[in-house]
Structures are given as structure tokens and as C-alpha cells.
């Protein structure tokens, strides 16, 4: 089934705390945003341990997020440049350091969350109805992304697990506050971490970031 792409881009540089109307995108700008999103989603090594977000403004794409795979940062910039209407790409993606300790922590956290009976339906091939996709858009609006304000997130996995020097950050979108709470608890139960930041957004509600 083809990906259903919903465009919810805010060009404001500040987050949801600022008041004011969201500028409307022209048809050609919307087309460019869709192409950028498609290029990033098709990156072969973009997965659950990475997180990408972007903004588009008058031909300039700004990329942010975290890259676990060694070539993802370069591939994301190259992919964004292929989209129509893109004149310049500013690549601010942070490359995560190579660390066996972090790798072990990533996989322990992955299994703790995606194999949990309460959360396993979010895993690829889990209990969701065929064709159901937790895509970023709609309830997970660009203006609501606390870590990257004004950026449009991209991803297939609903819960992305970022590990950096032993610190775990959960990014993504879930259905309910209970799902967010359980995901944070499971991550906190993983031995060896130096802290957990639960930045999951509950679809359709105002996000709350909690440090556990």
C-alpha cells in the first residue's frame, strides 16, 4: 500500500508557544514538501534508531535530527536536493557516536518497548489492522515538536529510540497517554541508561515532555 502523505508544515522558526497565524503554503511549495518527505522516507537505512525532521522555506531545506547509520546524514541531504523547488540544503543532522554500549542499550530498549504486550501493536507486523500507519502529520504537527520547533518530522516507526552516550530519548507519536506512559516506563526499566526523556506526542493532544 502506498504511503499516505499528509502535509502539516509550519514555517515559523519558533515553537507552539508563540502566537500568530500559520502561513499558508502555495501549491508548488506543498508539492516540494511532499517530494522532500518522500525522498527522506525512501532512504534505505533510515530506521527506528534515527530521527529526521525538516523545514522548507523559499527553496531552502533545513534538516535536523539524529543519524545512527553512518551514511544517513549524507544520504538525507542528497535526497532532499533531488526534490523539485529545492535550491539549498542546510544539514544540521547530528551523527550519533559509534559506541558498543549505546548499541546494546538501543536493542534492549527496542525489545523492551516493541515486545511489550501493551505496545507490540506499534511494531512492524504487529497487531494493527493492515494498512494502518502512524505517520507524522495531523495530530503530530510540526509546530508541536519541542526538540525541533517549526520542523516537520519524518518516519515510519511510531516510536523512535535515540541513544546518545547512554541517554535515551523517545521521539514519535502514539495513540493515547497510556501508551506514552508505558513506553517511558519500559525505557526506564532498561538497565544501564543514564536517563530517559520521553518526548512522545499523543496524537491530537498537546504534548508534554517528561524527564524520567
Regions found by a protein language model. Name each.
Residues 2-12, 16-212:
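N-terminal targeting leaders
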